[in-house]
């Protein structure tokens, strides 16, 4: 899968792309990441990419010309999505990550900055807007890296035991169950006996019940969705 990231700060991605599962996925050519700086496509000698908004207002906007030129310089694969990282976008979720990982061969991630981008970018270039939630960050690189990480780990061959992906939080609209490792007794806190019993049926029942109780308590929105989907 190919990722083209339109960013004013390519160095932001250097360390993450060399580390952990992302680095391994790139080494194995499961994914390819291309960093494109729109400043290289600016029209003036100062490589200016921002300007004041028409009608007045606080802050600066990213100009349309460098962004359009940066995206139009890319190789186009058949199944491509052009994503703008913006607080106005659809909140990111596990189903969205899975859709992006399965339905597309190329993701173009545009990192917003300042007060945002010229609306013509959104109207005539972008095919999807994504947000991390109801809050504002200083740059679009953090959301873009989140999407990159979330999608790549779902690609076949990235995670060693792909079965584990199906058991994670949100995959079935339930949060994950509590997990423990050795020692069985730490200070005065003991691992639940059922997990040490060797009774796999009892363990599965306990884990399912923990998922249900945890989701009801912590994420009533997910619990409502789960009850609707599961009768």
From Swiss-Prot:
Predominant localisation class: cytoplasm
Superkingdom of the organism of origin: Bacteria
Localization, per the record, is: Cytoplasm
Any keyword Heme?
A: no
Q: Which parts of the sequence bind S-adenosyl-L-methionine?
A: 112, 132-137
What Enzyme Commission number(s) does the record list for this chain?
2.1.1.228
Gene Ontology process terms (BP): tRNA N1-guanine methylation
Family from the record: Belongs to the RNA methyltransferase TrmD family.
Looking up PANTHER family in the UniProt record yields: TRNA (GUANINE-N(1)-)-METHYLTRANSFERASE
Q: What is this protein called?
A: tRNA (guanine-N(1)-)-methyltransferase
The taxonomy runs: Bacteria, Bacillati, Cyanobacteriota, Cyanophyceae, Oscillatoriophycideae
């Amino acid at each position: 899968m190919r990722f083209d990231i339109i960013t004013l700060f390519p160095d932001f991605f250097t360390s993450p792309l060399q580390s952990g599962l992302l680095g391994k996925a790139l080494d194995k050519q499961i994914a390819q990441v291309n960093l494109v700086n729109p400043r290289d496509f600016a029209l003036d000698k100062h490589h200016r990419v921002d300007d004041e908004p028409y009608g007045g207002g606080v802050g600066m906007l990213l100009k349309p010309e460098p962004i359009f030129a940066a995206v139009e310089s890319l190789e186009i694969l058949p199944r491509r999505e052009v994503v703008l990282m913006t607080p106005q976008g659809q909140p990111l979720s596990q189903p969205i990550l899975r859709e992006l990982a399965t339905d597309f061969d190329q993701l173009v991630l545009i990192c917003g900055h300042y007060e945002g981008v010229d609306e013509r970018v959104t109207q005539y270039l972008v095919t999807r807007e994504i947000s991390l939630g109801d809050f504002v960050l200083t740059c679009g690189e953090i959301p873009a890296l989140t999407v990159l990480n979330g999608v790549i780990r779902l690609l076949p061959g990235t995670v060693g035991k792909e079965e584990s992906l199906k058991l994670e939080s949100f995959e079935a609209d339930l949060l994950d169950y509590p997990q423990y490792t050795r020692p069985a007794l730490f200070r005065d806190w003991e691992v639940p006996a059922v997990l040490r019993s060797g009774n796999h049926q009892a363990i599965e029942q306990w884990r399912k019940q923990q998922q249900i109780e945890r989701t009801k308590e912590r994420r009533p929105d997910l619990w409502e969705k789960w009850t609707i989907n599961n009768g």
